[in-house]
Amino acid sequence: MAQSNQHVSIYNPKVIVYSIGLTTAILASMSIYRSHFVRFSTSLDVPKTLFRTKHLHGKVTSVGDGDNFHFYHLPGGIFAGWGWIRETPEINKFRKLKNKTIHVRLCGVDAPERSHFGKPSQPYSEEALQWLRQFILGKKVKVKPLSVDQYNRIVGRVFIFRWNGWNDVSEEMLRNGVAIVYENKSSAEFDGMKERYLKVENKAKKKKKGLWGIERGLTPGEYKRLYK
């Protein structure tokens, strides 16, 4: 019996449909990989297309001030093997993690300034630092990047998962009186939360929580302008 030697043209509708389907699947896979499995080492590595639309998941590796921290990006979470196949980094390993972490500035809040370059520290600055360390250091958080500031830090809205769900870290700082609502109107990032933050801050004031329970001095914004 003679074998068929029919040639299937690349213009055959079935071939075209198959090619389109395969190409679409490949492009979708690449997009998912870039969005969920590519690790970003520093703030400058994060694509602008992810700002305000996506969350970066990872681990807080150090907290050096009352309103910012370093964060090791763990894309894909446990599905990418982090914590069981791939090791997550230890905390406070500064040399080992140099150029491997994203510096994050919490949006919408300002904590009392610590002593830097011979400048005096503000009252309650150490308490604010210790509160933030206790709350997030060594823990998994998610960061919604909003912008990059003059120090190449990602200004972001940060969430930590607790017994009652995802908690906004900036809001929790205001609730506990360890930070105030950010005052610089021209460069402030709030992700639409300013009015809520002001309400939470006002409640903390009335209850004299944290820094509201001590004698008032300069606000963090006033302090920075004074020692600029």
Curated annotation (Swiss-Prot):
Binding site residues for Ca(2+): D110
Active site: R105, E113, R153
Compartments where located: Mitochondrion; Membrane
EC top class named in words: hydrolase
Enzyme Commission number, as recorded: 3.1.-.-
PROSITE patterns: TNASE_3
PANTHER family: EBNA2 BINDING PROTEIN P100, SERINE_THREONINE-PROTEIN KINASE 31
Membrane topology: Single-pass membrane protein
GO cellular component terms, A-Z: membrane; mitochondrion
Gene Ontology terms for molecular function: endonuclease activity; metal ion binding
Listed InterPro entries: SNase_OB-fold_sf (IPR035437), Staphylococal_nuclease_OB-fold (IPR016071)
Protein's organism: Komagataella phaffii (strain GS115 / ATCC 20864)
Keywords assigned: Calcium, Endonuclease, Hydrolase, Membrane, Metal-binding, Mitochondrion, Nuclease, Transmembrane, Transmembrane helix
SUPFAM superfamilies: Staphylococcal nuclease
All copies of domain TNase-like, residue ranges: 54-214
Protein name as catalogued: Probable endonuclease LCL3
